Amino acid sequence: MAKKRANGEGNIRKRADGRWEGRYTAGYHPETGKRIIKNVLGKTQAECKAKLSAAMEATRGIDVSRADEYTVATWLRSWYEIYAKPNIRISTANRYQLMVEQYTIPRIGSIKLTKLTAHDLQKLYKDLMENGRIDRKSGHGNPGLSSTTVRSLHLMLHSALERAVKERLILRNPTEDCIAPKVQKIEMQILPPEHIKDYLEAADRRGLLPMFYLELVTGLRKGEITALLWSDLDTLNKTISVSKQYVKNPNGELTLSRPKTETSVRKISIPQDAIDLLITEHSKHPENPYMFPSPATGEMYYPDSVVNLHKKILKDAGLPHIRFHDLRHTFATLALQNGVDVKTVSSMLGHYDAGFTLRTYTHATRQKQDEAAQTMGSFMARVM
């Protein structure tokens, strides 16, 4: 007969097959009120007792009736739809969906949520770093995801599992015990001032001077410059309005959304030369609403197509490779080095904080600090 454990901690009995079984109340069904009974097995009474104690500790404070419903896959999908998607930007939601459906669920989705461990997650990170890429050319390049992408996935999982803790589905967030990969910082590059003329001449030969001239005097993100409409240009006040961007969802489709942050919705002053170029560009397609429609389709450029055009311009000009995003860095660096204050540059870039701009472009402000030091040194020499 069953042996009652002390303090109501469960029952242990020896089964007919010789093994020991421990049974305990894990919770109560929310509708029927009936006890939810679970069990553990052991070869010896001591082993069974230890397993029973561990199992009861693991369920203490957990809503077992709900926790048992979830695997990693079902919880991540539920969290994404209910908590994440309604409260984040479209581009972030698209990235989360990709990380949930393509990177995480195929590898650990079948694990019960209550059984997920830090070890499972650490193995996931390792596998993604080594074999995580979905679309890659056979035999070429690194098949793994970047440390930046895997760290982003770690942060997403931390958020999802933290919600599971608050919902009393798991006792502790297993990401707390993980070692997230260190981000390998990409060295910032710019288009040197002595290369700008060659670059723009190459762009002009391809009929792309207005777009890439505007990029160099504004530092727009690729999704922002492709989403510009002719109506975004104010020729009287010499500004362009940035209020939208095109981003790619996990299915490869383009989606129009608000820019990266609220501070990314902005008006940017542009020089008269840029306005003149834009007016000339618009005269080629006066009925088209887009600032830079694709000659092939008449629709807006696919953002990655603009990146490819940038690569062709560099090749035409015989210039070393830099990323399209480095044109944004070029604008910021040259503006700061030529005396534009950091707050103005920050607002033009759409950064949430001038401090972020300052930290990002320390190399540019260092030159101005050196000049300031020399100025003050000369002043002090005169007065002493």
Q: What kind of region is each of these model predictions?
A:
Residues R15-E21, T25-K123, E281-N288:
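N-terminal DNA-binding module of tyrosine recombinases/phage integrases
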Residues M1-A2, E201, N237, P250-D276, ...:
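C-terminal secondary-structure termini that scaffold catalytic or DNA-interacting sites
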Residues D232-T239, P320-H321, V340-T362:
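Short, polar N-cap/turn motifs at the start of nucleic acid-interacting alpha helices
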Residues M1-D17:
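Short N-terminal "domain-start" leader segments
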Residues K182, I190, Q245-K248, I275, ...:
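Catalytic-site neighborhood detector that most strongly recognizes the C-terminal catalytic loop/helix
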